[in-house]
Amino acid sequence: MNLKERKAIIAGNWKLNKRVAEIPAFTQELQANLPAARCCDVVICAPYPLIAALETAGQGCHLGVGAQDVSEHQHGAFTGEVSAEQLSDLGAQYCIVGHSERRSYHGETDLQVNAKTKILLDNSITPIICVGESLAQREHDLTETYVAYQVAAAFSGLTAEQAMHCVIAYEPLWAIGTGNTATSAQAQEVCASIRATLGKLYDLETAQTISILYGGSMNAGNADELLAQPDIDGGRIGGASLKQVDFSKIVAATAQGACE
């Protein structure tokens, strides 16, 4: 199965950027630059306070809306957390879980990533599950072993049907926010190994339905080459998603591959 037959997705991650007042201009310019062909899903994962405004403003350009994290708890005395039910009420369709910054800065564990994945699925929100190796792990030839462990932990207890409603984002930690990017061959090698791991956890048919995104400093200059790889079905975009023109170029490259 190739890119055209799997869901192609470009998911921007605004991180701790943008304000509500900036959203109308962003979505208007994005709409003007988006390709006419609607062969891929385009999503912005925004900070919590921006989700509702982005959902409203994005309706005209068919822009999907996502969150950047979710509580592993459904309700209760958990000050400062946001539940999957609340995200659903805001209109969130996707949610990032296990981002390297959450794992590094907030000590998020594989068990928490698994719990968040399950609670999102229970609320009909698509989890974008982030996995990836550090520079030290790559240098010690541990990339595939470590990433396979992360995938297995995230999907623990999920049925094949549930797994098919998940998205994986491969983000090499050494390429996040550094301007460094894995070569297309390096990215494809790891994404292919992720699909092989899914095949072992479930079966080949299930593995072939799950979209795998590349999330390590993809930009307008390298998107074409990365998206041409057989096991890369889109991108989870950081800094480039803050600029409408750059983001639109990445979307256009994805749509072109998906429509062929």
What are these regions (language model features)?
Residues 1-260:
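Active-site loop-to-helix "anion-binding N-cap" substructures in soluble metabolic enzymes
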